[in-house]
Amino acid sequence: MISVESKLNLDFNLVEKARAKAKAIAIDTQEFIEKHTTVTVERAVCRLLGIDGVDTDEVPLPNIVVDHIKENNGLNLGAAMYIANAVLNTGKTPQEIAQAISAGELDLTKLPMKDLFEVKTKALSMAKETVEKIKNNRSIRESRFEEYGDKSGPLLYVIVATGNIYEDITQAVAAAKQGADVIAVIRTTGQSLLDYVPYGATTEGFGGTYATQENFRLMREALDKVGAEVGKYIRLCNYCSGLCMPEIAAMGAIERLDVMLNDALYGILFRDINMQRTMIDQNFSRIINGFAGVIINTGEDNYLTTADAFEEAHTVLASQFINEQFALLAGLPEEQMGLGHAFEMDPELKNGFLYELSQAQMAREIFPKAPLKYMPPTKFMTGNIFKGHIQDALFNMVTIMTNQRIHLLGMLTEALHTPFMSDRALSIENAQYIFNNMESISEEIQFKEDGLIQKRAGFVLEKANELLEEIEQLGLFDTLEKGIFGGVKRPKDGGKGLNGVVSKDENYYNPFVELMLNK
């Protein structure tokens, strides 16, 4: 069952019990998810049907279409039904229909509804076109890996965050030439809270760059070009968290992104987005990512920036179990689950390195197929660049000793400023030195029987199992109200975006769920 040799002497019966509890939690929540849709799920359907662009006021056409249907109390049937019916009635394309709605020339909800079977058949046939494009993107990615080969060992993941997509491209190309394997374009501060996706190439962001489809296209093009120069496929990463999770997943699938931040709980805890909204949105976004071959990264590392990494380690493991089960329900295979964790214990903690090693090895053994995402120290980086570089070196050592996969490079200037190109070069050099010098160390080391490292892992697993038992009894929504994750309490009916949640009609239809889950 477990392909990774167990060095921690973990109780795998307990692992299976914990996994079963997480599955029960996910299935319980999934019942709620499947009875509801949201405005952004329906906007994602519009985008996947080919609706794009903005009106004269810069309002995206998918928003105009979905708001129009919602105002006329029709969203419970799904946008696909109204668009397909309008195509049958008018002979126009979805894009032309959206433009007609924007111009006030068409009311989708007043058109005579054709036979429902005919409408669903039309929606399905229209959806197949985009699904084929996404399949094609997946095969392009696979053929590039066949051509260049894929790297074994940790992937060096770096971020660019200038606010200007053209400057981001300059920095990303430099990072790729320095040895980066994954480029993540950080989003501008607050984009999570926009209930629409901006349009076009952007040059003004704060702490990051707007996620737009054009920005995705530009960066993908640049990375393909530099990838051909350096002889490897450079993975591109962005963020589908916030109020537009499935829309950004759809845009990423269309533009061939490779990695997406896509956590089931992050938006609830750290962006105060309503929990009902987030749970529905994460499901469709993961269906899209699963189908597109995109690796998702989850955000457990964020718990450790608000809660103590030593005391709350079990909440990270419990969340990893839950994220895994929600991903499986959305058809996302284990090989695409970049479950997150982080090297965030206080450097003053005695034996802290051993505890970090235990936690990382435990994640590796419990999720043997997952391309685990391991985050660098940030919370206890002080601006002392020399100590910071050493903290990052210890983090790099844990990665290679425990075979982490997606290795987010720490920056020596963390807590001072967003990284300069020179900072990135030093961080890449630090990691490459350690990964090369210690390449086979994980095959050479065992942990002392009943020693500190084994005992710590057993203790964290037991606590995670107890927590999952508690969550199973309470249900996920009540658990989030109690503040168990990251010490953050959120009300079930509070937060942003609840007014965008709609109950489905019995004739509701989303053709992409059917096509993508039955791949």
Curated annotation (Swiss-Prot):
Enzyme category, top tier: isomerase
Sites where the protein binds pyridoxal 5'-phosphate: 187-192, 241, 266, 271, 302
Claim: Nucleotide-binding is one of the keywords in the record: no
Residue positions binding adenosylcob(III)alamin: 57-59
Pathway: Amino-acid metabolism; lysine degradation
Catalytic activity, reaction form: (3S)-3,6-diaminohexanoate = (3S,5S)-3,5-diaminohexanoate; D-lysine = (2R,5S)-2,5-diaminohexanoate
GO MF assignments: cobalamin binding; D-lysine 5,6-aminomutase activity
Keywords for this protein: Cobalamin, Cobalt, Isomerase, Pyridoxal phosphate
Activity regulation statement: Rapidly inactivated in the presence of D-lysine and to a lesser extent in the absence of adenosylcobalamin (Adocbl). Activity is stable in the presence of Adocbl when D-lysine is absent. Adocbl imparts thermal stability at 37 degrees Celsius.
Family of this protein: Belongs to the KamD family.
Stated name of the protein: Lysine 5,6-aminomutase alpha subunit
Organism annotation: Acetoanaerobium sticklandii (strain ATCC 12662 / DSM 519 / JCM 1433 / CCUG 9281 / NCIMB 10654 / HF) (Clostridium sticklandii)
Gene this protein is translated from: kamD
